Amino acid sequence: GSCECEVAPSGPTHLELAEAWAPVWFHDTDDTSYASDYITAFDYDGDTVSHNNWENLFTPSADLSAVVYWSVIETLTHWYILYADFHPRDWTEDCDPLLPFLEPCHENDMEGAMVMVEKDDSEWGAFVLLATEAHNVLHVFRNDPAITAKATEHLEDVGVSFEATRHPKL
């Protein structure tokens, strides 16, 4: 399709970018109910009704295969690659669904990450920063010391490590 840009897009497709920079998810699950906190599709139970996810979690039709949603926003200078993961439950052993603000568990948990990549002379660009969001808390990670806490709120004093050159470890 046409983007009505002055310069026609070139380089990798958005799918290729999302695959090339896809983070490696390390996710802790509670050992009393592993499946409750799996990363899966929003419609893992065969419907898009969200208020029945706890009831449908252990039904035979539940497909708990791993799914990560993604999108790419492109400017003339950068790619912003967004990744989102869904959990039927955000689960802990001490979960009390009647106290959702006191206990860290709830139904329908969506969290995510954004990888910011600067376009350069290489095919895949250069990593700039990683932003993650979980439970309404933003964390920003970078490897360039020029990006400072004065310029970036929520900056963590931890660098980003990668698997296979371009895959940030979360």
Regions found by a protein language model. Give the residues of each.
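A domain-level signal for the mature, folded cores of soluble proteins
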Residues: 3-113, 117-170
